[in-house]
Amino acid sequence: FLIIHDKHAAVIDPGGDLTYTPLTLELMKYIRLQSLDYVIASHQDPDIIASMPRWLVHTNATVVASKLWARFLPHLTSAFMSDRIRSDFSDRLIELPDQGQNIPFGDTVIKAVPAHFLHSVGNFQFYDPISKILFSGDMGASMVDDAQSPVTDFDAHIPSMRGFHQRYMCSKKVMRLWANMVRDMDVDMIVPQHGKSFVGKAMINRFLDWIGNLPCGVDLLTQDDYDYAGLINSVKVD
């Protein structure tokens, strides 16, 4: 996702090497790469930020990520790419504290809001107070063919979301805490990294009501999921 405000620009969750070239070609239709202020990462997954070294080499952008990942992100950089980066990595990194913070963006801000354990232990979402869009990362993600259009039939959309959230999200408690936070925000659109967006207060509230009551992650685990004896008994040695 690309946010542009006056002469400022930020890209959110730009992905890995597979997406770097096509993404930069699209970005150059709207901005000069050298004018990019930020490369923002919701969490540490390869499909989120593995292309970081290339952004550091080819732009002057600052990387924004959770403080938990500050010591891990340099491991994405090969020795070859490290030699090409023009400055020390720590000088081009904003480490977000757990409670989040405002990221300066011209005469406004991008708000980093906490979304920890949804699914990463150091996870953030990003809110644009001008457009009132919440870029929600993996929260609200869906497995659909047509991701360009927003959700219009929420009940029909549930099957494309349920399995992903039950596997990747930590617990119903965390999702409910997150939903309560979003209800206190002035959000007109929730845009996940994958799948359809939720547009308008009514559709957003439908999603928040559903996600805040969905058992997932550790809620679904039993002792059968940690059955060492069953594993041993199932192993056959010829």
Where are these regions (language model features)?
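Conserved beta-strand hairpin/beta-sheet module of binuclear metal-dependent hydrolase folds
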Residues: 1-29, 125-128, 132-137
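Short catalytic-loop micro-motif centered on adjacent basic/acidic residues
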Residues: 10-13, 37-41, 112
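Short acidic-hydrophobic surface loop/beta-edge motif
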Residues: 3, 100-105
